[in-house]
Design a protein with these regions (language model features):
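Conserved class I S-adenosyl-L-methionine
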Residues: 1-50, 64-68, 151-180
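Class I SAM-dependent methyltransferase SAM/SAH-binding core
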Residues: 54-112
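A short glycine-rich, Lys/Arg-flanked "PGG" loop and its adjoining helix->strand segment in the class I
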Residues: 136-148
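A short acidic, Gly/Pro-enriched loop at the edge of an enzyme's catalytic core
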Residues: 111-122
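Acceptor-substrate binding/catalytic loop of class I
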Residues: 174-188, 226-227
Length: 264
């Protein structure tokens, strides 16, 4: 089983607490070239939801979406934020407790959702469906708990996401590590969703990274589940990136991110 779908690895190591995710979020916040902001852009997609919407987020992580868009959350929305990791739920609670909107935090596996049929107006599953071992079961469960006019929002990455970084990692590792084949991407996600949702739309978010801090980029690589480099290989990366920074003033890395909207 791949680490990316190994529930024990995900809950006990990669996402035992928010450390690894915080490292990755920080680099996107600081060095993304699109000043509008990823979370603002995602939140724009919620504009058609009712004023009293009931919303289920699966794989909420640290709750960064709601933290970043706190001022935009309608007062009558009912949010249920779920994750399989106790550490992530604790981080989300700490980030959002001051909002005081009656947000529920619950430990839930997307393959077995403990809510009644037709409960929610919307489901959100951002950057997490490639962690699900049985996505068909998860899609069926999400569909079941959505109302007849409900919608699933699901963000993921495309084939070119962080391409240059993976190329550098591939080279210094002698081909041992590189870009991994995610099981739910911008290229293959629509077909998977259409088995359960008749209408699926994809929007892409234009962005890239211009990184000026080598230490943060090294920390990003260290945080990744799919990459295990030796200290010698890390030093090679650090040297190469430092040279690029001196020569070009920044390290350019492509981003390829987008959002599916799947309607009942």
């Amino acid at each position: 089983m791949s680490k990316l779908t190994d529930k024990e690895y995900l809950t006990q190591k990669q996402y035992k607490d928010s450390t690894n995710l915080d490292v990755r979020v920080a680099i996107h916040k600081r060095f993304s070239t699109n000043s509008y902001g990823w979370f603002n852009w995602v939140f724009d997609s919620f504009s058609a939801l009712p004023e009293n919407a009931t919303i289920l987020e699966i794989g909420c992580g640290t709750g960064e979406l709601w933290k970043e868009c706190e001022s935009r959350i309608p007062k009558n929305w009912a949010l249920t934020l779920t994750d399989i990791s106790d550490g992530m739920l604790d981080a989300a609670w700490r980030n959002l407790i001051r909002i005081h909107r009656g947000i529920k935090f619950e430990k839930v596996d997307s393959q077995s959702i403990p809510y009644a049929d037709k409960t929610f107006d919307a489901g959100i599953a951002n950057y997490m469906l490639y962690h699900v071992a049985d996505r068909k079961k998860a899609f069926a469960e999400i569909k079941r708990v959505l109302k007849d006019d409900g919608v699933l929002f699901s963000a993921t990455a495309g084939a070119n996401h962080l391409r240059e970084m993976y190329e550098w990692v591939f080279r210094v590792s002698g081909g041992r590590h590189g870009q991994i084949a995610l099981q739910f991407t911008l290229e293959n996600g629509k077909e998977q969703l259409q088995e359960f949702f008749p209408r699926v739309e994809l929007s892409r978010y234009p962005d890239s990274l211009q990184i000026t801090d080598v230490d943060m980029l090294i920390a990003y690589v260290r945080s990744m589940a799919s990459v295990e480099l030796s200290e010698e290989e890390i030093q090679k990366l650090e040297q190469e990136w430092s040279e690029i920074l001196v020569k070009d003033g920044a390290i350019h890395i492509s981003k390829d991110a987008g959002l599916f909207q799947a309607l009942q």
